[in-house]
Amino acid sequence: MINPISFRPGPVTFWTTLIYLALLIPIVIINEKTPAAPKTAEPFKGVNLTEAWLDLTTITRAYHPYNSKFNEEVRRYLLEKVETILEENGASWVSDGQMTTVKDGKSAAVTVFDDNVSNSTFVMGKSNGTTFTRTDSINNAAYFEGTNILVYIRGKEDDEGEWWEADYAHGMRRNAKGLTLVNAHYDSVSTGFGATDDGMGVVTALQVLKYFTAPGHQPQRGIVVMLNNGEEDWLYGAHALGQHKLNPFIHTFLNLEGAGAGGRAIVFRATDREVMAAYARTSHPFGTVIASDAFGLGFISSGTDYSVLVDAYGQRGIDLAFFKPRARYHTNQDDTRHTSKGSLWHMLSAAIHTTKQFSGDTGNTFIGQRPDKAHGKVANGRSSNGVWFDLFGKSFVLFGLRGMFAWSLTLLIATPLVLVGITWLLRNLDKDYFFTSTVKTKEHPEYEAVPIGGWKGFFRFPFALGVAVFFTISSALLMNKVNPLIVYSSRYSVWVMMVSIFYFSFWMIMRGANFVRPSALHRGYANLWLFVFGWIVLVAVTALEDRRRIAAGYIFVFLESAIFLSCLISFVELLAVPRKSSYALQVQEDYDGQEHDHNGYQGFRDSTDEPSLRARAESSASAASPPSPTVAQEPSKSKAPAGTTNGLSTAPSVAAHSSQPQPAPTTPIPGRSSGAPSTASRDENESEDDDEPTERTPLVGGNGTNDRGRTTFATTYRRSITALVHGARKMEEDGEPYDHEQEWSGHLPSWAWFFQFLLLGPFMIILAAQTGLMLTDAVYQTGSDGSKLITPYLIIFVFTVLLILPLTPFIHRVTHHIPVFLLVVFIVTLTYNLIAFPFSANNRYKTFFGQYIDVATGDNKVCYTGIEEYVRPIIAELPSASGREVTCGKSLRRGSTISTCCFDGSAVPPKLGSEDDNGLPEDSYADLITINATRSTKRGDSSRTTARIEITADNTKSCFLQFKKPVSALAIENGSGWDDRFGQYPEDGVGLVRLWHREFGKTWVVNAEWKGSETRKEYDENDGTVICMWSDANTPGTIPALDEALQFVPSWAAVTKFSEGLVEGRKAFKIV
């Protein structure tokens, strides 16, 4: 019966293919399928999924950016919804400013903050101005008036009363255990309905409020549910939180966000291990620390409120977000039609569980002095770095980075020592076959060294790996050169292409090499090379763990651990083979026995006709295994003696049973001195010797002149026969070598490979496949945003290698059927990937829209930004662009592959004012922006000049103020002052100020100051430009250019906003 796990082609092909398919198929299904929502509307008390979905459809009926009328309607709806929830739950609540004490002298369970007061002025970093006011890099600042809604749910252990007021109970402890924030933003972009960005976050936050205000669900520590406004343009709502009186008491947070349009909500990033412990036991965990480290290293530049909460306020928490498909992100397909209740439930269930864990932690996990002692940040204890990842979206692995560092260091130091120790032991036991090519025996030191096949196949693995890597990376580079965006719609085709070529090319080299020179050490050498390469990578991973606190290398830590154990098995299984000296002795004795048999039947033969000991050993090592012993028949001169196979005797020779003595061999054994006569002289005497033996004739053949070249009866007859018989019995007991491999390999356990593959394979396949797919999903549709087009291909390449590596030590045993099939698959997918159009109606290419007007001259341009190759065909479909010149240039705000293409937009003029205009003459926009800029010099200080600039814009909440010369000081009237938590005022001044009001048409008053300005030339340098934004496209005809785009662009294209405003109107001013 065939061993079902023997190291033979059939079992190896079957088990490896089965395990790969059994793991990869579920991983792909899980990656594509969102866990189903509960069938009941109320999965548990205090949560109503149907109600949440209805709220979502209500707030996503129209675009609702901060600078739109519908945004204000959404805000009113949310305030009413909060009140309805509290009333239905019977919770005692008050609005901020009312008395917190209710009946029976108890404090209200809930306080609602309708925040129309908080505002923030802060530095934003550098930019190159706006679209049509390009300058050298200048410092940006912002002034923003918030409209956040905050609901405080009092915890059981919270202080009573209005403890958050600065003058409340002076000297008393003020809610030292802190609060947990649940945050979501209710504004959308101007071109998206915001179902997942961030409508689902908003309705999830409402259900969190509903759950924790339901009877019996009061949290241990207080919870703040915040619905913030203004996140989309520059995280403004989170900046406004910094001015709220609850902010200093928030220790932990859960930020609910959307950077895709459905699917599962992933842990985008997290601050530490302790906050992840709160998330870890959700019903469907999803995420990996790799994503968090990618943010930390700057590989992902997308911003969420998490950045402000952590970097500015020092809070500890989690960013929970939707992240795919990116093609629908910020477009009109971010609606309820293109998402699901399953996605909503995935976020909602995780949010309630995590919030419950945060608020239920009454220990000191999130309390205490900060280790960095940073000024202005909340004292929320000491955190530790963590490592985390999910398995199949059902379980979650979480442990400390410090522990992984110790583990990595142990692997680096201990594992080489263990392998060196095993090698030393094998050498002492005379079983170190890996690094020994030949061996001599003490019994016959004069013999030629016996080859045992060590080092055979040693360099195959790195060569095969190099070839496979070359072909795979070449396919990636070819895609990037010929059709770089095919991954945008066909990422699985790219995955299959790379996996197929890597598998086939690696198999081709390894199988071919093993066919030409079979080696039983092939598998062991592959494991050894894997260990060496893994150890080198682990050095870099360990350094990053220690110096940069990067945990993303956990895959390589697990991989090297598995490789070490597999490598250890390859060394340990050598204990089952005979000693090298024993094997060599057997080969030499078999040789002697064959010499005896040949001469016993055939007389003396020419020494040149007899193969050397090395040739016999090599023949023995490469021939098929012997059959069962049979009774010897008299052989002819041209055939090997019966009872021998592959140069090794399997039955006693006839000489052992003959009543007559047989002639001894005269052929010299290699390595001995020989006095054998020449062929001619031997032929002359042969008949004479055979016919008449004398008293000088030796007992076993030959004659007196050949003494020195002969063995005695004792060394040739008895020892060879015993060894041959023993060898035959031993071969029957221990099995046969496989397909011309070294004969001693028949003693190796044929099942060891299976356990090696179980160590290397399943867990690494899971990690590589699901992590590779997750990272691919995160980036495969970012090329249209300006990201590097090669990035998704490099990710797929790296994880293709990691995916197939566990198979590589055994791949030479796989039958040709699988690799040949994959070669065909590679050819098909390569052809498709090279010629297919990269976009479709379900995977639309995103182009960025903007319209730009000079309100003084009426100059009007419509611009589309993206990859020029695809932007021009899009523009060609627009009626207003027909017959007009289209000019393109590199975009400064996007990547190097992105261009901005513009044409005259006079055919589609926007209607921006409060009242519709008819005809729109050249100067019809002149009254949209009113600027009054006056200068004054400080008394007694002629080196400084100040200016008061008043800006009023019709039907908008947003204008930018850009100066020719940066201002050395800046203040907004009625503003809260400069918030240095976001950075000190720049020494080289501020060149651009972004101004945001919470009301339409309200006037901004900006006080600016310059150094110098004593000459007319310097006065002129103090002039500038005002750029105002209009973003409300809900009423058809308001922005006809956008209406046209949504109607006429090809089905494979989508339109999204380029910047804060769909329309930007600019007007220059002089300070007088």
From Swiss-Prot:
Binding locations of Zn(2+) 2: 197, 232, 330
Biased composition (Polar residues): 643-661
Keyword Transcription regulation in record: no
Top-level EC class as recorded in UniProt: hydrolase
Positions contributing to Zn(2+) 1 binding: 185, 197, 257
Site residues (Transition state stabilizer), renumbered to this chain: 329
Cytoplasmic membrane side: 1-9, 426-457, 514-523, 576-747, 811-817
Membrane topology, Vacuolar segments: 31-404, 479-492, 545-554, 769-789, 839-1072
Chief site of localization: membrane
Protein localization: Vacuole membrane
Protein topology in the membrane: Multi-pass membrane protein
Cofactor note: Binds 2 Zn(2+) ions per subunit.
EC number(s) stated in the UniProt entry for this protein: 3.4.-.-
Cofactor(s) the protein requires to work: Zn(2+)
GO biological process, one term: proteolysis
Family: Belongs to the peptidase M28 family.
Function according to Swiss-Prot or TrEMBL: May be involved in vacuolar sorting and osmoregulation.
Protein name as it appears in the record: Vacuolar membrane protease
Species whose genome carries this gene: Neurospora crassa (strain ATCC 24698 / 74-OR23-1A / CBS 708.71 / DSM 1257 / FGSC 987)
Taxonomic lineage from the root: Eukaryota, Fungi, Dikarya, Ascomycota, Pezizomycotina
